[in-house]
């Protein structure tokens, strides 16, 4: 069969790699793809938001199955367009992708269906928000309602910081229309854990847990980013936590969406906070995380096409989802200055060191070919250096070893990815 993957990051590279392992797939296309994905798929110069062109391409090339990696096209309704054209497409429709597309919607959903989450208020008026903050308890969290590349969340320790945050989100519109509505949420303390799942509208199957590192700098300092590294599984995601989440969060979310007339098909990413009062939902994403996909998909034993088709066909209950009893760590190599200002276009060397090594992998995120055919940097997050091992400590040591194999001029990384492994 022919498969089209939509997106251009490390997550899509991980999806393409999983698809390439499927015995059912003869040909992979990726739109727009990147320099690393080009080794596995034919990259097509169509942007992820160019729905008409993507649908035409899928029709013209007799694509059997399309996988949407990114949040923007999902929230924009790309799956609806593919389905209207009679094409099979993996991901939630527009009315279900709102689970990620609007934080106000997801908070209201959790409140209505008693899914554990932080206390909150939604605001569409900056003056009302400021008035509310006058009597609030700090620290407090401000969230832009819409998509903001994972950067629309501000933790404010004082009233002054909160006032500045309201200005940033609602008045200066730093995140554009994503800030038309703002969620003010109680600050929760505990460990953050990500859990990925496959969903077919009624059945949910949990993949594995992972732990992200959002801040740009060592010691969780600096600005929020899309994610600087990850490890899977999380040692803090215990059987007890799993039991609680299965009872009160996972199926409850799928059932809530179905009851609202928004059946969810695709991947739900649960961002959880393990608090003293038990696990609570921090956020939902309507797709694989990045770099969560890079540490979870390499551990999956199943043929990804079998699982994704079952989601689309509503037969996920027939799938026995299985994962290797191992560990995986990803360290992101970024451009110095990310997530604010950074230079691009630097030549990258050392890729050949990964050749023939099953347990090491270099996922490409912000890369492209220059006019001379060299692979150069083309984004803030450039590569995801990933390694598997029998234990988290072994996988971490191997991933950091492999970060030395690749060189480019403004290479930057965190040196403490997986520090929490030592605290487990």
Language-model features, listed with the residues they occupy:
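ATP-binding N-terminal substructure of ATP-dependent carboxylate-amine bond-forming enzymes
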Residues: 1-94
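Active-site nucleotide/adenylate-binding loops and adjacent lid/helix of ATP-dependent enzymes
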Residues: 4-5, 100-182, 211, 235, ...
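Solvent-exposed alpha-helices and their adjacent loops that cap or buttress functional pockets
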Residues: 20-21, 36-38, 60, 90, ...
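Short, charged, surface-exposed secondary-structure boundary motifs
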Residues: 38-40, 53-55, 98-104, 217-219
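Internal nucleotide-binding/catalytic subdomain
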Residues: 156-293
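Active-site "cap" helix and flanking loop/linker of ATP-utilizing ligase/carboxylase catalytic domains
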Residues: 246-268, 285-357, 370
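Generic C-terminus detector
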Residues: 367-372, 376-424
């Amino acid at each position: 069969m022919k498969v089209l993957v939509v997106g251009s990051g490390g997550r899509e590279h991980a999806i393409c790699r999983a698809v390439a392992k499927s015995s059912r797939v003869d040909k992979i296309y990726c739109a727009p793809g990147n320099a690393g994905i080009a080794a596995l798929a034919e990259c097509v110069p169509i942007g992820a938001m160019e729905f008409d062109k993507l649908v035409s391409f899928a029709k013209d090339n007799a694509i059997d199955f399309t996988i949407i990696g990114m949040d923007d096209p999902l929230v924009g309704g790309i799956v609806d367009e593919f389905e209207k054209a009679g094409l099979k497409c993996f991901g939630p429709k527009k009315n279900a992708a709102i689970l990620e597309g609007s934080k106000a919607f997801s908070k209201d959903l959790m409140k209505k269906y008693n899914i554990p989450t932080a206390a909150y208020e939604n605001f569409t008026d900056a003056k009302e928000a400021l008035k509310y903050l006058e009597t609030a308890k700090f620290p407090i969290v401000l969230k832009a309602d819409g998509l903001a590349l994972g950067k629309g969340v501000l933790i404010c320790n004082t009233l002054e910081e909160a006032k500045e945050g309201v200005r940033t989100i609602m008045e200066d519109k730093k995140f554009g229309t994503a800030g038309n509505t703002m969620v003010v949420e109680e600050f929760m303390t505990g460990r953050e854990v990500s859990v990925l799942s496959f969903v077919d509208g009624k059945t949910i199957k949990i993949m594995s847990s992972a732990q992200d590192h959002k801040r740009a700098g060592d010691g969780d300092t600096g600005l929020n980013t899309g994610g600087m590294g990850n490890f899977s599984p999380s040692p803090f995601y215990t059987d007890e936590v799993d039991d609680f989440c299965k009872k009160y969060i996972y199926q409850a979310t799928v059932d809530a969406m179905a009851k609202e007339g928004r059946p969810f098909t695709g991947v739900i990413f649960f961002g959880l906070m393990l608090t003293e009062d038990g696990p609570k939902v921090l956020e939902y994403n309507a797709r694989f995380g990045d770099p969560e996909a890079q540490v979870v998909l390499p551990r999956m034993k199943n043929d990804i096409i079998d699982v994704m088709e079952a989601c689309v066909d509503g037969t996920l209950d027939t799938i026995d989802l299985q994962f290797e009893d191992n560990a995986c760590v990803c360290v992101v190599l970024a451009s110095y200055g990310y997530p604010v200002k950074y230079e691009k276009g630097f030549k990258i060397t050392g890729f050949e060191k990964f050749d023939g090594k099953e347990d090491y992998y270099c996922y490409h995120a912000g890369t492209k070919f220059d006019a001379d055919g060299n692979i150069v940097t083309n984004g803030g997050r450039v590569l995801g250096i990933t390694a598997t091992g029998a234990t988290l400590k072994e996988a971490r040591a191997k991933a950091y070893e492999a970060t030395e194999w690749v060189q480019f001029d403004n290479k930057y990384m965190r040196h403490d990815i997986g520090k929490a492994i030592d605290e487990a």
